[in-house]
């Protein structure tokens, strides 16, 4: 059993057919880098009902968490909100630079371009054809995105990550992937019928 201090991060989700691939890939990476395997939730539990259901499933052994434990995952990382004042400050810095919706694509956090993740993620979440960046709903989404980014930025800064496995390279899912790429960490997207390796020239499967 690998006992190093580094971590393989594998996304925690309900994509049952992908779990077999995650199992093999995470264990290969764990052996290669002598790393522990941690799973992670890619987003916050902003919905209290969803959070309650998550823990009820764990209690009654209905959770996919036990599938992850079966292939060596030691713990699951759930994002936590940062200091509100700090996030508000960072949000205002970003928002004040937005003069048109095209500027959204230029959003950079810690020298990482995440504008496309914000743009596409917002449209997907609210099923909208386009963005009005002056609406409260977009501002709340952007603030939440920035909060999530800085949780993962701090996690990468405070832990030794050897590799990451994500389900998607877009929306909020792409945050962990891009942080890994920025830090020269081996990054993969994987599913039931594919495994892609990613770097600075190839941060998406599209």
Question: Which role does the model predict for each range below?
Answer:
Residues 1-11, 28, 32-146, 192-206:
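Conserved N-terminal ligand/cofactor-binding loop architecture of enzyme catalytic domains
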Residues 3-9, 156-169:
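Short N-terminal targeting/anchoring amphipathic segment
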Residues 144-154:
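Well-ordered alpha-helical segments embedded in enzymatic catalytic cores
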Residues 165-167, 174, 181-206:
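Beta-rich, aromatic/charged-enriched effector core domains that present basic-aromatic interfaces
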Residues 27-31, 156-163, 175-186:
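Glycosyltransferases and closely related glycan-assembly transferases
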Residues 16-17, 171-174:
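Short alpha-helical
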Residues 11-22:
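A short, glycine/small-residue-rich beta-strand->loop->alpha-helix junction that serves as a flexible
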